[in-house]
C-alpha cells in the first residue's frame, strides 16, 4: 500500500513538472486540448451561467438539475484527464 501511494505521488509530481515545462517551452495549449473539448466546456459554462441566474433554489427539481449537470461535468473532466494523462505518457515514453 505504501508503494502505491509513493508511485501515485511520483506520477502527480511528474505531471506537474511536465505541465510547467510545456508552458515554459511555449507549447500551445491548443496542442493538448481538442477543439471539441473547448466547445463542450463553453457550452457547459453557458448552461451553468444560465442555471446560476435562477432566483430561487427552493425548487428541488431545479436544484437537482443544476447539481446533475455539475456531476456530469466532473465525469467528463475525469475522462478528459485520463485521456490527457495517456497522451502525456505517450509523449514521455
Swiss-Prot record:
Q: Where in the cell is it found?
A: Secreted
Please indicate the residue ranges that the annotation assigns to the motif Processing quadruplet motif: 61-64
Q: Does the keyword Nucleus apply?
A: no
* Signal peptide stretch: 1-22
| Record InterPro entries | Latarcin_precursor (IPR018802)
Which cellular component terms (GO) are annotated to the entry? extracellular region
Principal localization?
Answer: secreted
* An annotated Gene Ontology molecular function: toxin activity
Q: Which residues carry this modification: Leucine amide?
A: 92
Q: Please give the superkingdom of this protein's source.
A: Eukaryota
The entry's comment on post-translational modification says: Cleavage of the propeptide depends on the processing quadruplet motif (XXXR, with at least one of X being E).
On tissue specificity, the annotation reads: Expressed by the venom gland.
Tell me the Gene Ontology biological-process terms attached to this UniProt entry.
Answer: defense response to bacterium; defense response to fungus; killing of cells of another organism
Arranged from A to Z, the UniProt key words for this protein are: Amidation, Antibiotic, Antimicrobial, Cytolysis, Fungicide, Hemolysis, Secreted, Signal, Toxin
**Belongs to which family?**
Belongs to the cationic peptide 03 (latarcin) family. 05 subfamily.
- What is recorded about the domains? The mature peptide (65-92) probably forms alpha-helices which disrupt target cell membranes.
The UniProt function text for this chain reads: Has antimicrobial activity against. Gram-positive bacteria (A.globiformis VKM Ac-1112 (MIC=1.1 uM), and B.subtilis VKM B-501 (MIC=0.6 uM)), Gram-negative bacteria (E.coli DH5-alpha (MIC=0.6 uM), E.coli MH1 (MIC=0.6 uM), and P.aeruginosa PAO1 (MIC=18 uM)), and yeasts (P.pastoris GS115 (MIC>37 uM), and S.cerevisiae Y190 (MIC>37 uM)). Also has a moderate hemolytic activity against rabbit erythrocytes. Causes paralysis, but is not lethal when injected into insect (M.domestica) larvae.
Q: Quote the protein name from its UniProt record.
A: M-zodatoxin-Lt5a
Amino acid at each position: 500500500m505504501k508503494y502505491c501511494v509513493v508511485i501515485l505521488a511520483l506520477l502527480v509530481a511528474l505531471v506537474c513538472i511536465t505541465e510547467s515545462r510545456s508552458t515554459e517551452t511555449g507549447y500551445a495549449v491548443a496542442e493538448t486540448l481538442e477543439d471539441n473539448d473547448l466547445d463542450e466546456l463553453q457550452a457547459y459554462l453557458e448552461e451553468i451561467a444560465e442555471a446560476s441566474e435562477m432566483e430561487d433554489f427552493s425548487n428541488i427539481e431545479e436544484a437537482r438539475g443544476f447539481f446533475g449537470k455539475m456531476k456530469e461535468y466532473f465525469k467528463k473532466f475525469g475522462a478528459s484527464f485520463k485521456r490527457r494523462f495517456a497522451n502525456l505518457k505517450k509523449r514521455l515514453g
